Amino acid sequence: MTRMRSGGDSTRLLDDEQRARKSCREQACREELVERLARAIHEDGTTEPLKGLFLRRVSSPTGPEHGLSIPAFCIIAQGSKELYLGEKYYRYDPEHYLLATAELPIVVQIREASRERPHLSLRLDLEPSIVGSVMVESGLPSPRGRTSAPAMDVSTLDIDLAEAMLRLVRLVESPAEAQMLMPLVTREIVYRLLVSTQGDRLRHIAAFGGATNRIARAVKRLRADYDKPLRIESLARELGMSVSGFHIQFKAVTSMSPLQFQKQIRLQEARRLMFGEDLDATTAGRRVGYDDASYFSREYKSLFGTPPMRDVQRLRAAATASVEL
């Protein structure tokens, strides 16, 4: 006698079938993404085949790389990446994505990569104007409240977002189609990010009056005036914030204090001056605001692990690549 399936059995069977189909889609998407990135970038390094879309290949582990984040959506096709922002630690892989919403000093490291299985990743830069436009067209509300949001976080990469990014990568091989379709696919990606778990964070970069936007303006000012004395009272007043409120909101967004932020920007610029413009340590230190050469050397060693000129010699010997999210 044939046993009739109950409603519960049918529902479970349907759920199992849907999960299986989703798993197949995810696997196919990851495999195609790896194939296309490997085809698009043959040697180690970073390339920008389409405006705002960066592809990166790394065939050996890297040491800690210091650099600056920018507002961007970042995914990994193969491998994983570790990232430090102040006291915060992040790790992401093919099942997760990283969303950054401000320009901040970061440290990035790739621990596993080989010629047989290189690290493959991509980054899509995000324009606040496009985020704002998509919010308006889709009727999405402004960020909830006026509190600040962390400038960086990692979330699970869902299949719809992954497939949208894959469609963008496909356009690399079709320049004629890219001219017409890239703006549309980019807006789809922005929309999917806006309605994701990180959507509220992303909305902050388009909200002029929000606390996160005000901190972003402070970050921009500190980066531009890194060699000048830090005047917190004046900056907070300019942003319409109390000094204590500014400190609290700044650390909530950047994971560091304004003074720590300025120090990292100064030291990274000094490193660039010594490595790129062949300045000596004393001159580079003075250029970025350090009048005391000994103090500059101590601060530099504290951040980069070695004294200034020894660090630059190591960089030149290793021909270190620029940091990428």
How should these model regions be labeled?
Residues N213-A216, S255-V288, R310, L315-L325:
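Hydrophobic, well-ordered secondary-structure segments
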